[in-house]
Structure formats: C-alpha cells, structure tokens
C-alpha cells in the first residue's frame, strides 16, 4: 500500500504541535488520530480517562487527565469542541499566550481542503452513512481517509489516514460548525428539529443553514439528498448545485425497493438512473439503514466505483459501535435466552427507527428498552414525541436525564417523563435514578425471548457491557 504523505496539509507547515481539549470525544479523537498519523505531534486532555484516551496514548500521543493551563505550553494551535466551556483553563491560557484556538470542524475543514471531501450531514444517520461510504470506498481500492463519530467494528477505530485523495467525514450541524467544511460531495440524510438552541429555536434558520452548507460545494460539486424527507424536498429548489436524490419514493434517482427482512439482516434492490438494479445484502436491520445504504450507493456510483465493490462493501460491513450493536444471545437462569442490543439513538425519530427495526425483524419477540434521555432541553422540546415513542415498547426502564452539562429543567426530568408515560396507559415504566441500579431491575423483569435494548447517548452506553458481563445471572 502507498504510504500517506507526512504533513499532507501544505499551508500548515509552520504547525508542529497540536493540542486537543476534550480529546476523548468521538469527533475530536478521530481528527487527532489522522493528524498524528500525518506526523504532527499531538497532545490532548479530557476530564477522565476512557478507552478512547487510552487508545490514543498507546498510539504515542501525549494525553492528560484533567484540564490545566500548563497542558498547552509550547503548542502551536489548540483545537476545542462545542462541548468545552469557554472558561476552560486551557482555552484561557492559550488565548493569553496568543496561541490560535480553532473549533473541531475548522480543523476538519483544513484536512478536507486539499482532498476530495465527502461530507455527510443530517439530524440522523450520519455515523452509519459515513461508515458505509468508507467501507465501499475501501472495498473499491480507493483507500479513503475517514473521520467518523463512532467506532467501526471492523477496524476498531473511528478514523484512519488513507493514501488516496478521498476524505469521508461527518458534518456536524449541532453547533452549525459544518459551515467550515468545503466538500466536493455533500450528503444530507434528513433535517429534523434538534439542537434548536443553536438556531435560536427557529426551524427556518436551521433549514437556511443547511442550504448554506450545501452552497459550500463548488459549482461542480454534488448534493446527495434523501427524497423521502419532506423538509429536504422543500429545500431542493433552493439548491443551486447538482442534486441526486435517494429513498423509497418513486421519483428518487436511487430508489430502494423489494426489502426483505431476515432476522436482523435484509436484502433489497436499488434502481439507479443508469444500468440494471443493484441487489444489496445488508448485515443490519431497519428501513432507516436501507436509506443509509442507498445514500452510500448513490455516492459510490457517482464516484465511479464498480458494482461488485459496492455490493461487497455493504455485505461485509460489520456495523458501528453503539449503532444497533448486537452483543449476542444470553441464557437465563430460568431457561430460555434474551438478545442484548445497544443503540446510540436519542432523538424520538431515532428511537422510533430502532423500535421499528426490532418489530420488523423479530415481530414475535417482546421489546424491553432501557432508555436514558439525553439533555434536558431536548427532553423539554420533544417531550410529547418521547412520550409517544416510548409508549410503544413492551417493557420500559427509564433513567434520569443525562445532563451533558445542562442545568435541570422542571418538568423535563426522567421521573416526570415516566409519570406521563404511565398516565397514557400503554406501558408501565420503571424509573431508576442511577445507572448502577439497572442490572437488578432488568434481572427481575426480563422474560425468555426478550430483546433488551440499552438506548441513549449518555453513559447508558456502559450498561450493555455490564449486562453482558453479568450474563443476567
């Protein structure tokens, strides 16, 4: 394999030492890893040690636990994310020392500037779609650089430096920082009301920002957009770039159809503007993943990747950590077994997609969900949607809201949400204050044949490994 160039970014020749504040985050760690592999001297800090920080340290990066002013001494630039408070001592010291401080997306934009960038945006499905594109491109011998918001199960990492000109990355709309990116291809999976504080609570502003992002494409660039999403279709007339649509709708350029579920796997066909329909096998359940795969096929076809590579890249895809990650089947002491699944989805639309995937693939099994709401503002803004979707499971254990740095909001906490769901009368939720109390509750309530899903974006992600280790004994 061709070795990637050291210092691939020509205009960053004056930069040697790069420090990441909050390096344990998925997006931050991926960029740090790519820059490290390009030969830059990378350091980073996070509030606590994690599997991610240990992995970065093992690669040779200097990783600090805790944020201290001295950590930025001698560095050339500091990278931070929107999750880092502006009063962070490292940011204050960097500005005091006149060290440039840039956002995560700005650094990603520099990585993309001199490459053929493929940026995947949208409220839901970014990580999986980005991963599927990277998988197809790798199978097609394109050897892409990729930066993904989750761990690729096949690679054990969320980023890699490839030798080709291709860079596949997520474009984060949560803080509007995706406007720093200037890709050649932009994918928009869907547009939903989320992170509305960034947009002043105005959905119109959110939509205009997506249009602005798409106009960062050069005039010869391509926007690949989901033709099933009504918000997206309403914006297409405003996009002064080539648009390729995908979805289940008849008028989409890339149309998925004839979907057949096979116990967590699925087969379907994709009609394309030219050539024969493409037969696809996907090792993941859910119609949302059919859409994600169809977006990846649209991008790959437009970039000239052959059909065999597309089919094999999808068939061999091993999934992404915490995206409907199946831990396996576990026997119960009383006989029978349960299947354990972990999923990152934390918006009502994402939770609904997970539930539908289970219902479609395992229609005769009981769905037992352990859900942790993420952010008080999201719980407040989408309260009724959460009540409706969570009422559709068979057994519900509800945790307190994972604050993610927010202050509690009266009426938007886990206990209040649990009461409202109980009042609707479709499911009787069990509220558990702390995550450490969940295994005992699950053990008492579980029944043979259950599919247990740990769901959410907070520390509920640590629960599935705990349950798997205890084996429900």
Curated annotation (Swiss-Prot):
ATP binds at residues 122-128. It catalyses: UDP-N-acetyl-alpha-D-muramate + L-alanine + ATP = UDP-N-acetyl-alpha-D-muramoyl-L-alanine + ADP + phosphate + H(+). It comes from the Bacteria. It is an enzyme of class 6 (ligase). GO terms for molecular function: ATP binding; UDP-N-acetylmuramate-L-alanine ligase activity. The keyword Nucleotide-binding applies. GO terms for biological process: cell division; cell wall organization; peptidoglycan biosynthetic process; regulation of cell shape. Its EC number is 6.3.2.8. GO terms for cellular component: cytoplasm. Pathway: Cell wall biogenesis; peptidoglycan biosynthesis. Keywords: ATP-binding, Cell cycle, Cell division, Cell shape, Cell wall biogenesis/degradation, Cytoplasm, Ligase, Nucleotide-binding, Peptidoglycan synthesis. It is found in: Cytoplasm. Signal peptide: none annotated. Belongs to the MurCDEF family. Cell wall formation. This is UDP-N-acetylmuramate--L-alanine ligase. It comes from Teredinibacter turnerae (strain ATCC 39867 / T7901).
């Amino acid at each position: 394999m061709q070795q990637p160039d050291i210092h691939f970014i020509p205009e960053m020749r004056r930069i040697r030492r790069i420090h990441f504040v909050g390096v344990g985050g998925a997006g931050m760690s991926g960029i740090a890893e790519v820059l490290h592999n390009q030969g830059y001297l990378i350091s980073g800090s996070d509030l606590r040690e994690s599997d991610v920080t240990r992995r970065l340290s093992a690669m040779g990066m200097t990783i600090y636990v805790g944020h201290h002013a001295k950590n930025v001494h001698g560095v050339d630039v500091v990278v931070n994310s929107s999750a880092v408070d502006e009063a962070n001592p490292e940011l204050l010291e960097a500005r005091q020392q006149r060290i440039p401080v840039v956002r995560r997306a700005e650094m990603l934009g520099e990585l993309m500037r001199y490459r053929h960038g493929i940026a995947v945006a949208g409220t839901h499905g970014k990580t999986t779609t980005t991963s599927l594109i990277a998988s197809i491109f790798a199978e097609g011998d394109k050897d892409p650089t990729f930066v993904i918001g989750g761990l690729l199960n096949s690679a054990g990492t969320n980023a890699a430096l490839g030798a080709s000109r291709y860079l596949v990355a997520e474009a984060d709309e949560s803080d509007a920082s995706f406007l720093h990116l200037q890709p050649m291809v932009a994918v928009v999976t869907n547009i939903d009301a989320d992170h509305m504080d960034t947009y002043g609570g105005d959905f119109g502003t959110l939509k205009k920002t997506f249009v602005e992002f798409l106009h960062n494409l050069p005039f010869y660039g391509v926007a690949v957009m989901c033709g099933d999403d009504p918000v997206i279709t309403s914006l297409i007339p405003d996009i002064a770039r080539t648009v390729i649509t995908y979805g289940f709708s008849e008028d989409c350029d890339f149309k998925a159809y004839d979907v057949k579920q096979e116990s967590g796997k699925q087969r379907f066909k994709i009609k394309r503007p030219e050539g024969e329909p493409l037969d696809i096998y996907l090792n993941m359940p859910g119609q949302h993943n059919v859409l994600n795969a169809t977006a990846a096929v649209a991008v790959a076809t437009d970039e000239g990747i052959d059909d065999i590579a597309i089919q094999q890249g999808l068939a061999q895809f091993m999934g992404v950590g915490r995206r409907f990650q199946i831990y396996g089947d576990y026997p119960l002491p009383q006989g029978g077994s349960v299947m354990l699944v972990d999923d990152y989805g934390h918006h009502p639309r994402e939770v609904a997609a997970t539930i539908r995937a289970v219902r479609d693939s395992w229609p005769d099994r009981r769905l037992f969900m352990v859900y942790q709401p993420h952010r008080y503002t999201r719980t407040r803004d989408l309260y009724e949607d959460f009540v409706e979707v969570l009422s559709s499971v068979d057994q519900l254990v509800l945790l307190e809201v994972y604050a993610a740095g927010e202050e509690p909001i009266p009426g938007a906490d886990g206990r209040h949400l649990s009461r409202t769901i109980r009042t609707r009368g479709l499911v009787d939720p069990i509220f558990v204050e702390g995550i450490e109390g969940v295994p005992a509750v699950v053990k008492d309530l579980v029944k043979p044949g259950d599919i247990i899903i740990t769901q959410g974006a907070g520390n509920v992600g640590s629960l599935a490994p705990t349950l798997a280790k205890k084996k429900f004994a």
